[in-house]
UniProtKB/Swiss-Prot annotation:
Name used for this protein in its record: Leukotriene B4 receptor 1
Name of one Pfam family that matches: 7tm_1
GO biological process: neuropeptide signaling pathway; signal transduction
Record keywords: Cell membrane, G-protein coupled receptor, Glycoprotein, Membrane, Phosphoprotein, Receptor, Transducer, Transmembrane, Transmembrane helix
Transmembrane segments: 22-44, 57-77, 94-115, 141-161, 180-200, 223-243, 269-289
Length: 351
């Protein structure tokens, strides 16, 4: 998201003006849905959840990352509507840096959720030992530090340049090598590696649950597919366009050619689509709430997270972990926060 969020200004041609409406619509939907939705999630966890599970902490940070990027949407909407950047170089770099940090934080949080669930299913005793709030806070701190570091190239390459009597907040590279490096670096660290980890984790979960013939393995399998597809749907097109541009740059093709301009316009729309990823999670929580939404009202997020935080209670008797099933929500949570807790999964520590 940080690479080229405003690389193409609203053009004066009729086609360009028509195309610019789609990003405006997508950004507006993301803002209208995501801002109150994620704010509600943050409020629910901080104000209504007395004992926050590790899952709740991960969801809280994911909502905060989504809120951060959504707060930049008004600046980009202003740019799209006016066709010029009005917030100077500092605003240009800050907005895009926030987008970059949020992108990395969101992807890393989803990856950690996936690895957490895989460990809980594959190594329940190990998961019980390491899955504490203290350890989770260290992991979360590490995620944010890494996200701030990975987004630094945005601060280096972003600037405001004049173009056709307007100002554009764009990336400016000293050489084509710098441009290719940035595009590949963002695609690999911001999508490819995390996506491979998510796929590997949930594939392992599905395989193990199917082998154990758990009662809900079929539903879990469907959720795994939905999670992976949703993750890819918002981010894969954006990174593919960046990879194509990196290839064109290496081949020495003219970026001002008709094909190059179409590529810019495609990214123009896909970046706005990526913004929607910051608004989809609250919608998934509401859908997952089902009966909880009707019975618990505004407290459904708390009930949902309490249900997904631990589907079993565990006690040690004579050195053996004994699980006792608890009540579960009407449906498991679809999305990166789905706990996939089974009868082999230990509870979250309250440390």
């Amino acid at each position: 998201m940080a690479a080229n969020t405003t690389s193409t200004a609203a053009t004066s041609s009729p086609g360009g003006m028509s195309l610019s409406l789609l990003p405006i619509v997508l950004l507006s939907v993301a803002l209208v849905v995501g801002l109150p939705g994620n704010s509600f999630v943050v409020w629910s966890i901080l104000k209504r959840m007395q004992k926050r599970s590790v899952t709740a902490l991960l969801v809280l940070n994911l909502a905060l990352a989504d809120l951060a990027v959504l707060l930049t949407a008004p600046f980009f909407l202003h740019f799209l509507a006016r066709g010029t950047w009005s917030f100077e170089v500092t605003g240009c770099r800050l907005c895009h840096y926030v987008c970059g940090v949020s992108m990395y934080a969101s992807v890393l949080l989803i990856t950690i959720m996936s690895l957490d669930r895989s460990l809980a299913v594959a190594r329940p005793f190990v998961s019980q030992k390491v899955r504490t709030k203290a350890f989770a806070r260290w992991v979360l701190a590490g995620i944010w530090v890494v996200s701030f570091l990975l987004a630094i190239p945005v601060l280096v390459y972003r600037t405001v340049t004049p173009k056709n009597k307007t100002l554009i907040c764009d990336s400016r590279y000293p050489s084509d090598g710098h441009k290719v490096f940035h595009l590949l670096f963002e695609a690999i660290t911001g999508f490819l590696l995390p996506f491979l980890a998510v796929v590997a984790s949930y594939s392992d979960i599905g395989r193990r649950l199917q082998a154990r013939r758990f009662r809900r393995s079929r539903r879990t399998g469907r959720l795994v597919v939905l999670i992976i597809l949703a993750f890819a749907a918002f981010w894969l097109p954006y990174h593919l366009v960046n990879l194509v541009e990196a290839g064109r740059t290496l081949a020495g093709w003219d970026k001002n050619s008709p094909a190059g301009q179409r590529l810019k316009l495609a990214r123009y729309v896909l970046i706005a689509l990526a913004f929607l990823s910051s608004s989809v999670n609250p919608v998934l929580y509401a859908c997952a709430g089902g009966g909880l939404l009707r019975s618990a009202g505004v407290g459904f997020v708390v009930k949902l997270l309490e249900g997904t935080g631990s589907e079993v209670s565990s006690t040690r008797r004579g050195g053996t972990l004994v699980q006792t099933p608890k009540a579960t929500p009407t449906c498991p949570e679809p999305g990166p926060t789905d706990s996939f807790m089974t009868s082999s999964t230990p509870p979250e520590s309250s440390k």
